[in-house]
Amino acid sequence: MNSPGAVDVVIVGAGPVGLTLANILGGQGVRTLIIEERETLIDYPRGVGLDDESLRTFQSIGLVDAILPHTVPNQILRFYDANRRLLAEMAPPDARFGWPKRNGFVQPMVDAELLAGLDRFDHVEVMWGRRMQTIAEDADGVTVEVSGPDGPASVHAQYVVGCDGGRSATRHLMGVSFDGTTSSTRWVVIDLANDPLGHPNSEVGADPQRPYASISIAHGIRRFEFMIHADETDEQAEDPEFVAELLRPFVPHPDRVDVIRRRVYTHHSRIAGSFRKGRMLLAGDAAHLMPVWQGQGYNSGIRDAFNLGWKLAAVVRGQAGDALLDTYDAERRKHARAMIDLSTMVGRVISPTNRKVAALRDKLIRGASIVPTLKRYVLEMRFKPMPRYHEGAVYHAKPPTPASPVGTLFIQPRVDTREQDNVLLDDVLGTGFAVLCWNNNPRTLLGEAAFTRWKALGATFIAARPSTQLHWTKDDDPDVVIVGDRTGALKAFFDAHTESVLVLRPDRCIAGADIAQRAPELSTALFGILHLRQGGENGATGPVLYVPQPTAESSGTVGRAS
């Protein structure tokens, strides 16, 4: 085996998290090597739901237009009781982050687009059919020993990220715990081609006799999931006749369905004791496992990649100190834990097999649906934990105000610029830091010293205005992009907060916010908390990709203002 020599980052695992992370790093000029034990991508669906945050991440790496054809946007999820009476419905209407909150998707096709995206980068490589054997850390980095069909090899890197799944070898070598529970309940998942039902949405049957799920994906694929009883074996659950009987209540001719795959699985609720140990980090299923009920296993992994990617790139390129990577665990652990707890709780609500318990549950849910605020809480998925970082790579004013937007994701409305109408905001912000002011010039507010330092870090400077002022050119600054508030969403945001100057991280989290006059102090605080340095690059090739896209037109999911 030819040794790949030295790279900046080694990623173990070519699943969706590893591929997304590699695209983020590749776009920032970071030399990256993926080591994958399999010979090719997995060709069957695992995850079936994408949320708005994942699509926003794919937008940031320039691949969302390639991915959208493999999705079903605005997918409704309905919950039924044993008599097929509607208990609850999830149909979130807003797209505050630029994309629908619920989307069905075909994972193998999306993963293939993520892999194809790496072809854009000469400095990113995937080694298939190679197993990571050992990791040795020293003062300068890590040495990864790899085995394969043509012999061993070693590669030296600054960091290793384990994206190698629930049985992560990276986590094992780190000596990190993976505490939690594994459910004793088993389920069989059946993926069908040529969808025998054909309708576009999904349902969960909270039937105590046998809870089930029926999920429309894309390209004519439907997934059924059924609970397996204690007296039924795994072998039974994979028998074609047994599967046909499971499908019979839903499909007129279950013996004629086109089965792509069927398998038995259990639900895990686990989280790693640490997401970082020295120069080794974990992401995705290697860091956390959760039940399927909120469709957040896949999406939580993509959040990991987006959170970690920009930080790794900044450290490798010498723009930030190594301590920035400590904020990855501080930020992602709490949110991943909240998602695990929510998914576990929803599973318990859906799957009681005791009829009296199920009847009581049905009464409680129907009673709650009478109350408009509770009904909207479910309909609009307001129960979904949103990232809100109280510590990490964020600066909170002291004392912090309850309404402060710091540590939350910034909205992504459609905006106008002098050059282009009706574009998603992130396509104007670029892929790095951004300083965004309402109705002010960022250079004037920051002062020349802070402005110059942010500019050296590749930041984009945005002056947001009402659309009526878009083409007012007095005091124009060539380093500042003027954005017209096409929909009024930006004005509404700033109207709801006292802060009028925002510093946005590359993952679009609000790193800091304050009133206009305190912008210089805000910058000084953030340079310290984010461990940002002047200068940098340290051998990385530098940012090489920025692909603004007319994305929402192709999705048809975000309303266009005329």
Swiss-Prot record:
Its EC number is 1.14.13.127. Its cofactor is FAD. This is 3-(3-hydroxy-phenyl)propionate/3-hydroxycinnamic acid hydroxylase. HAMAP family: MhpA (MF_01652). The keyword Cytoplasm does not apply. It catalyses: 3-(3-hydroxyphenyl)propanoate + NADH + O2 + H(+) = 3-(2,3-dihydroxyphenyl)propanoate + NAD(+) + H2O; (2E)-3-(3-hydroxyphenyl)prop-2-enoate + NADH + O2 + H(+) = (2E)-3-(2,3-dihydroxyphenyl)prop-2-enoate + NAD(+) + H2O. Pathway: Aromatic compound metabolism; 3-phenylpropanoate degradation. Gene3D superfamilies: 3.30.70.2450, FAD/NAD(P)-binding domain (3.50.50.60). Belongs to the PheA/TfdB FAD monooxygenase family. FAD binds at residues 8-37, 275-285. Keywords: Aromatic hydrocarbons catabolism, FAD, Flavoprotein, NAD, Oxidoreductase. Catalyzes the insertion of one atom of molecular oxygen into position 2 of the phenyl ring of 3-(3-hydroxyphenyl)propionate (3-HPP) and hydroxycinnamic acid (3HCI). It holds the Pfam family FAD_binding_3. It comes from the Bacteria. One of its GO terms (molecular function) is FAD binding. One of its GO terms (biological process) is 3-phenylpropionate catabolic process. It comes from Mycolicibacterium smegmatis (strain ATCC 700084 / mc(2)155) (Mycobacterium smegmatis). InterPro entries: 3-HPP/3HCI_hydroxylase, FAD-bd, FAD/NAD-bd_sf, PheA/TfdB_FAD_monoxygenase.
